[in-house]
C-alpha cells in the first residue's frame, strides 16, 4: 500500500525526527544535482533481524545453520517487479570486512576490540523513498514478509502519515554535539614500521599493494543522530547513512561504491589516488594536476581498476565488462580522489549475492593480489576491522542491491566513537606520507563533533 505526498514539504531528516518507529535507518546521497543522488531512503519498524555473530547465524535470535549471505538473499528476495524506485522493501545493514574469512583462507582474525557482529541486517516492509528529482515522497507499507492484511496495512500507513504531521520536540533545538578528542590506537612510529614491513614484502614479490589502516577512538557524549545531521552538511558524500542497531549506531559518509546491481547491470567504483583539498580553486587545480601526474598514484589506480574488472568479469557475461569512467579527479570535502567506474551484465544464473561475494572486500581497502594482501593485513594490523572496509547498504526484494565501502564511517558504542582509515602501500611508498594520508582521510569523521560554517 502506497501514498505519494509532495516532496517540498518534508525532508528525510525531518521525517526521521518525527517518526516513532524502531530501528530507523536513513540512506542519502548529496549533492543532489547528480542523477545518482536522486533518491533517499528512510526505513523503520523492521519485520525481522538477521545477524552473524561469533560464528553463528541468527534470525530474530534463533540460530540457523546456513551460509549467511545465501540465507540473507533467500529470505529477502521476493520477485518484486522493478520500478523506478531503488528500494522495494528488503534488507538494510552491513557485511563486515572479516566475513571474507568464511570463504577464503586469510589467516587468524586479529582481536575484536569493538564487538559488532560480522553481518547485521534488519528486513523492512515499512519505508519511505524520497524522489528529489520529481519532488515526491513514496510512503509505503507492504506485506512482503509479515503477510499483513489490507486493513492492517491501511492502519499502519495512516499512523505513519499522522506522525509525520506532528512536529518533533527537538526540531528547532541546537544540535547536541561535543568536540571529540580522538586518539590513535597505535603510535605513528608503529604504523610507519608496518608500512616498511609491507614494502619489504612487496620488494620481495609477495604482493603488489597492501592497504594498511589504523583506528582512532574517543569518548563521546551527545545525540548520535545530531552527529549525522552535522556530518551530512560538513561532509556531503555519495553515500550518507545513519543506522540505529539498538546497542550501537553507525554513521557514515562513504565516497565509494563497493558494488551495485540494477536490472542485471553490476557496477563497481574503484577509488584510489589521494590529495588533500586546496584552499582555493587554483590550489585544487594544481593539486589535481599533480595527482594525475603522480606515477605512484596512477599506477595504484590502474592496478585497482584491473582488479575491479577481474572481480566483475568473474560474474558477468562474456565481453560485457566495460570501464565507463576512467581515472577522473573527483572532489570531496577534505580530499580529492582518482575515480573510475566498471560495469558488466550479471550472468543470468547468478544473483546479487554472487556479485557481493565476488567483490567483498574491495581492492581499494585490501590490495593486490587480494587474498595475499588480506593475509598480510591480518599479520600486520592488531585489531579486527569489523564494520570498517566492509559493505554497507541494502538488498532490495527486487533482487537489486547497492552497497558502499564502509569507509569514512564511525561506530558509536558504549559512549565511545571509533573511526578507521587506511592507505595503499606500494613499492615506492614513503611511510610518513602514508601515515599522513590516513590522518587526512579520517578528518571528515574525527571532526564530526565540531559545528563549522
Region roles according to the model:
Residues 1-453:
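Extended alpha-helical targeting/anchoring segments
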Amino acid at each position: 500500500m502506497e501514498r505519494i505526498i509532495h516532496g517540498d514539504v518534508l525532508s528525510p531528516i525531518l521525517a526521521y525526527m518525527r517518526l516513532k518507529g524502531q530501528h530507523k535507518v536513513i540512506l542519502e546521497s548529496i549533492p543532489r544535482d547528480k542523477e545518482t543522488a536522486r533518491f533517499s531512503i528512510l526505513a523503520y519498524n523492521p519485520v525481522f533481524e538477521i545477524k552473524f555473530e561469533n560464528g553463528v547465524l541468527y534470525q530474530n535470535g534463533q540460530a540457523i545453520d546456513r551460509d549467511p549471505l545465501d540465507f540473507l538473499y533467500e529470505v529477502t528476495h521476493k520477485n518484486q517487479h522493478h520500478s523506478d524506485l531503488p528500494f522495494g522493501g528488503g534488507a538494510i545493514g552491513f557485511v563486515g570486512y572479516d566475513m571474507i574469512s568464511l570463504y577464503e583462507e586469510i589467516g587468524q582474525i586479529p582481536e575484536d576490540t569493538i564487538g559488532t557482529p560480522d553481518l547485521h541486517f534488519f528486513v523492512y516492509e515499512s519505508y519511505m523513498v524520497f524522489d528529489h528529482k520529481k519532488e515526491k515522497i513514496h510512503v509505503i507499507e507492504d506485506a512482503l514478509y509479515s503477510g499483513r492484511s489490507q486493513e492492517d496495512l491501511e492502519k499502519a500507513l495512516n499512523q505513519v502519515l499522522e506522525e509525520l504531521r506532528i512536529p518533533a520536540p527537538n526540531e528547532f533545538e541546537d544540535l547536541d554535539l561535543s568536540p571529540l578528542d580522538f586518539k590513535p590506537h597505535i603510535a605513528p612510529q608503529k604504523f610507519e614500521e608496518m608500512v616498511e614491513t609491507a614494502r619489504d614484502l612487496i620488494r620481495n614479490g609477495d604482493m603488489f599493494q597492501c592497504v594498511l589502516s589504523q583506528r582512532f577512538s574517543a569518548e563521546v557524549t551527545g545525540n548520535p543522530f545530531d552527529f549525522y545531521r552535522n556530518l551530512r552538511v560538513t561532509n556531503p558524500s555519495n553515500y550518507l547513512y545513519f543506522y540505529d542497531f539498538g546497542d550501537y549506531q553507525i554513521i557514515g559518509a562513504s565516497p565509494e561504491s563497493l558494488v551495485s546491481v540494477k536490472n542485471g547491470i553490476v557496477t563497481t567504483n574503484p577509488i584510489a589516488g589521494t590529495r588533500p583539498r586546496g584552499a582555493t580553486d587554483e590550489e585544487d587545480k594544481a593539486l589535481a594536476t599533480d595527482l594525475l601526474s603522480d606515477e605512484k598514484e596512477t599506477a595504484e589506480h590502474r592496478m585497482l581498476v584491473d582488479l575491479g574488472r577481474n572481480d566483475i568479469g568473474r560474474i558477468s557475461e562474456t565481453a560485457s565488462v566495460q570501464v565507463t569512467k576512467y581515472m577522473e579527479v573527483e572532489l570531496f570535502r577534505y580530499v580529492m580522489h582518482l575515480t573510475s567506474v566498471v560495469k558488466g551484465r550479471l550472468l543470468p544464473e547468478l544473483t546479487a549475492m554472487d556479485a557481493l561475494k565476488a567483490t567483498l572486500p574491495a581492492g581499494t581497502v585490501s590490495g593486490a593480489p587480494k587474498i595475499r594482501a588480506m593475509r598480510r593485513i591480518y599479520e600486520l594490523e592488531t585489531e579486527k576491522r569489523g564494520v570498517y572496509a566492509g559493505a554497507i547498504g541494502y538488498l532490495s526484494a527486487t533482487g537489486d542491491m547497492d552497497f558502499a565501502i564502509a569507509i569514512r564511517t564511525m561506530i558509536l558504542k558504549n559512549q565511545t566513537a571509533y573511526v578507521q582509515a587506511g592507505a595503499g602501500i606500494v613499492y615506492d611508498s614513503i611511510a610518513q606520507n602514508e601515515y599522513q594520508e590516513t590522518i587526512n582521510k579520517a578528518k571528515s569523521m574525527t571532526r564530526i563533533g565540531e559545528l563549522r560554517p
